[in-house]
Swiss-Prot record:
This is Cytochrome c biogenesis ATP-binding export protein CcmA. The keyword Nuclease does not apply. Keywords: ATP-binding, Cell inner membrane, Cell membrane, Cytochrome c-type biogenesis, Membrane, Nucleotide-binding, Translocase, Transport. PANTHER family: ABC TRANSPORTER I FAMILY MEMBER 1. The gene is ccmA. Belongs to the ABC transporter superfamily. CcmA exporter (TC 3.A.1.107) family. Its main location: membrane. It comes from Rickettsia felis (strain ATCC VR-1525 / URRWXCal2) (Rickettsia azadi). InterPro entries: ABC_transporter-like_ATP-bd, ABC_transptr_haem_export_CcmA, P-loop_NTPase. GO terms for cellular component: plasma membrane. Residues 1-195 form the ABC transporter domain. Part of the ABC transporter complex CcmAB involved in the biogenesis of c-type cytochromes; once thought to export heme, this seems not to be the case, but its exact role is uncertain. Responsible for energy coupling to the transport system.
Length: 195
């Protein structure tokens, strides 16, 4: 369970949000809102990268400030790839951080990355870099996924693979929060609208 208690974020004297909400296991939530409404900031706060002006975030009934990192898998605008490293080196790096090396090859096969393993990430298109970042969702075992505009620049095939993966995560008890400008293609997802 993920709970936001009186989570407030202000920017330039403007209150972007003041949230009290709980996300239950087995849930998918799209965070929607105009540019500048705080979607990315909210995901960054939940990941622990950014601090709110006030309020608390609890994951599994523990304040995230007291939980050892990493407790979630966050993919933001900066994909977290080491561009000078190969696809395989990047996925190994992340799977070792999460102590989940047994899922590394499942990630490679799910997203059909076998032919790209020795490619440096800087040589990949932005869409393929996002696919490598999305493969991290399998390579890194975590029950909380925070995805910021990950669907952008993906081919239809890779977007479908990602959406199926998101549904599988929720069906296995995970919590998935994602922001997207694209129309929600996961019918079971909830919508959190930021104004």
């Amino acid at each position: 369970m993920l709970s936001l208690h009186q989570l407030q974020f202000n920017i330039e004297q403007r209150n972007l949000f003041n949230l009290n909400i709980t996300f239950l296991p087995s849930s998918i939530t799209y965070i929607k809102g105009a540019n500048g409404s705080g979607k990315s900031s909210l995901l960054r706060m939940i990941s622990g990268i950014m601090q709110p002006n006030s309020g608390n975030i609890y994951y599994k009934n523990n304040n995230i400030n007291n939980i050892p990192k990493p407790y979630c898998t966050y993919i933001g605008h900066n994909l977290g790839l080491k561009l000078e490293m190969t696809v395989l080196e990047n996925l190994k790096f992340w799977s070792e951080i999460y102590n989940s090396s047994e899922t590394l090859y499942a990630a490679i096969h799910y997203f059909k990355l076998q032919d790209l393993l020795d490619e440096k990430c800087y040589s990949l298109s932005s869409g393929m870099q996002k696919v490598v970042a999305a493969a991290r969702l399998i390579a890194c075992q975590s029950d909380l996924w925070l995805l910021d505009e990950v669907e952008t620049n993906l081919s239809k095939e890779n977007r479908d693979l990602l959406n199926n993966l998101i549904v599988m995560k929720a069906n296995s008890g995970g919590i998935v929060l994602l922001s997207s400008h694209l129309e929600s293609s996961i019918k079971s997802a909830q919508i959190l609208q930021l104004v």
